[in-house]
Amino acid sequence: MSIKRLSMRLKKGIHRSWNRMTSLEAGLEEEKEIKIVEEPEPRPWKVLITGGAGHLAENLVAKLEEMTRDSIRPKIREMLEKEMPAVISTKVDKEVEKRLPMYIQIVLVDVLEPRGRVLKHHVAFVKCSFDDECTMKTALEQVDTVYHLAAVGMTGQYARDRKACMDINAVGTMNLLIWARNSGVQRFIYTSSVGVVFSGEPMYNATEEVGYPDDFYNYYCESKAHAERIVQKASGHRMRTTVLRFNGIYGPGEKRVTERVVKFMLTGMWIATCKPNGVEAQTQLSSVANCIQGLVKAELALRWSDTPHGQIYNIMDKTPVGTFSFWTPLNIALGFSSSMITVPATPIRLFAYLSQIIADRMRIDPIVSVLEVDLLLVNNTFNIEKAERDLGYEPSVSAIPEIIEHYLHRLPPDVVRPKGRSDFYVKVAVLVLGTILIFVAVFSFTFWMYLIFQRLSRWNPF
C-alpha cells in the first residue's frame, strides 16, 4: 500500500472519528438539555383551607390557581418553543394544567362538601370538622400554609350554644395552631369579623388597636375574639400568623349577604331607608375580591422576615358608604323605583329584637339579627392604612357593578323587569300597616306580661 493511499485512509478515519465525536457531543448536549427540562421541580406549595365548602374558599382556590398558572406559564412556553414551535399556541395551556399539581396542591376541609367544579387533580377534599385531631393531623402533613376560614355560631344550632362556640371557635383554633406548628406549617392566616370589637356605639375610622368590648353581641363574636388573641400569641419563628377582620362579606354569588338582599329586592319591598337623627349611617363592607386580595397578600407578606407577624388587619372596601343607599343601584338595575321612604329606627330595632327572641325560643335562625340591624343603623367605618402599608393592600371601591352584571345575566328577564311595578304607594301602605301591627303586638305583649306579674305578686297561697 502506497503512502498516498495510507494517508487518505488515515484522513478518512480521522474525519469519521471527528464526526462521531461531534455526534456524541451533540447527543450529550441534547441529553443534558432534556435532563434539565425533566429534572423534578421543587416540592409543590401545599395549602390547607378550612371552611373549604364556602363561597370565600371557592374564590380563594380560583385565585391561587390563577397565580400559579401565571407563574409557570412563561417557563412552559419557553420549554415548548424549543421543542415544538409550530404548535406552541395550542400546547401551552394544556401543559400548564398538566403540570399544575407539581407547583400547587390544595386541601379543602369542611363538614359540607364543596361544589364539584372546585375539586380537581390538584384540589383534594377532607370531610371533617377542623377540630377533629386524628383527621387534621393527617391532612396537615407537608402543608406550608393554612387559611383558617371556618367557624360556627353565626347562624344555626350553635348560635345559641356558648360552650360549642367556645370549644370549636376558640379551643379548636388553638388546637389547630398546635397541630399546624408541629406539622411544619410556616404560615397561618385567620379570618375574623368586626363583630369582635363592635359594641353598638358609633365607630369612626376605627383602627386595629380598638379594644374588645366587655359584652359581646353573641357567642360567635365572643369566641372569635378569644380566637384572635390565641392566633396572635401563637405567632413565632417556626410559624408566623396573621388575623384579617372582614365586615359584611358581599359579592357576585355570595349567599349570606348579597343573595339575601337580592331576594328581598325581588319581593318589591325594598322601598324604605332609615336615617337615625336624620343622617344615614356609614359603613365599610368587604367585597369578596378585596377579601381574597387580603388573604393572598397576607400570605405573601409572611414569607418575608422583615414583615410584622402576629398582627391584626382591617380588610374592607376603600371608602365608607351609606348602609342603605349603597344597594340602591342594584335595586334600580332589577327594575324597581328609586323612590324611598324614611322610617324611624325604633320599629326596625323592635322587629329585630322580636325576631331574635322568637328564633331563640323556636331554635331557628332569625329573619334578621340585632347585630345586623345595629350595623345598619350605627356608624361603623374602619382604617385600612395598616394593611395598605404592611401587606400592600390595594382595595377596590365597590363590587356593585360586578353584582349587577352577575344577576342581570342569571335571572330570567321577566323576574328582573316584570311589568306592573308602579305600585309603590301600595307597598308603602303595607309597610306602614306592618309597622303598626308590630307596635300593637309589642304593646299587647308588654301589657299582658305586666298584668300577669301584678297578679303573681299579690297571690299568696298561704
From Swiss-Prot:
Its EC number is 1.1.1.145, 5.3.3.1. NAD(+) binds at residues 51-56, 220, 224. Gene3D superfamilies: NAD(P)-binding Rossmann-like Domain. This is 3beta-hydroxysteroid dehydrogenase/Delta(5)-Delta(4) isomerase 1. GO terms for biological process: cholesterol metabolic process; nematode larval development; sterol biosynthetic process. It is a multi-pass membrane protein. Disruption phenotype: Mutants are hypersensitive to pheromone induction and form dauers more readily than the wild-type. Pathway: Steroid hormone biosynthesis; dafachronic acid biosynthesis. It is found in: Membrane. The lineage of its organism: Eukaryota, Metazoa, Ecdysozoa, Nematoda, Chromadorea. Belongs to the 3-beta-HSD family. The active site is at 224 (proton donor). Disulfide bonds: none annotated. Hydroxysteroid dehydrogenase involved in the biosynthesis of dafrachonic acids. Catalyzes the dehydrogenation of cholesterol or its derivatives and the isomerization of the double carbon bond on the sterol ring. Modifies sterols into a Delta(4)-3-keto-sterols such as cholest-4-en-3-one, precursor of Delta(4)-dafachronic acid. Contributes to the production of Delta(7)-dafachronic acid in the XXX cells. Dafachronic acids act as ligands and bind directly to the nuclear hormone receptor (NHR) daf-12 suppressing dauer formation and inducing reproductive growth. The chain crosses the membrane at residues 321-341, 428-448. It catalyses: a 3beta-hydroxy-Delta(5)-steroid + NAD(+) = a 3-oxo-Delta(5)-steroid + NADH + H(+); cholesterol + NAD(+) = cholest-5-en-3-one + NADH + H(+); a 3-oxo-Delta(5)-steroid = a 3-oxo-Delta(4)-steroid; cholest-5-en-3-one = cholest-4-en-3-one. Expressed exclusively in the neuron-like XXX(L/R) cells through all four larval stages and becomes fainter in adults. Keywords: Cholesterol metabolism, Isomerase, Lipid metabolism, Membrane, NAD, Oxidoreductase, Steroid metabolism, Sterol metabolism, Transmembrane, Transmembrane helix. Its main location: membrane. GO terms for molecular function: 3-beta-hydroxy-Delta5-steroid dehydrogenase (NAD+) activity; oxidoreductase activity, acting on the CH-OH group of donors, NAD or NADP as acceptor; steroid Delta-isomerase activity. It comes from the Eukaryota.
